Amino acid sequence: SPGVAQQPSIASLAIVAHELGHAQQDASSFALLKLRSGLVPMVNFTSWLGPILFMAGIFLGVYDLAWVGVLCFAGAAVFSLVTLPVELDASRRGLAMLKRNGLLQTKEEKQGARRVLTAAAMTYVAALAQAISTLLYYGSILGGGRRRRS
């Protein structure tokens, strides 16, 4: 965004470089970026459908339907799993661009850019952990509920 790109800071420089890393991925037809882009419509649909199927299955006592809802939650986990290396690669490319073009002059600037990009990457690690946790949580609700009824 212009607000980020026009700020005179190492953080802004690192964020812009990360986005340029995505542009490089796109220009080089980076396979995981293409895969992630292809998954977006499916993930949008299953993220909407999953909770509906899960709740309907629980309320109607049709547990196979609820399991289909849980399977829909798996779409978010797969998307997060694919997204993580895409984002790490964009950060790696961005940092390399900054170094190659002499935009990071001091050790502190290099460390600062690396810290910003690492912190950004950790948000994707957290998203993956959250998606897996959600999948396991709803799966355990169904799995535990089935054991009690048997």
Segments (PLM) and residue ranges:
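Polar-ligand-bearing catalytic/cofactor-coordination segments
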Residues: S1-N44, V78-S150
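Hydrophobic transmembrane alpha-helical segments that form the core helix bundle
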Residues: M42-R93
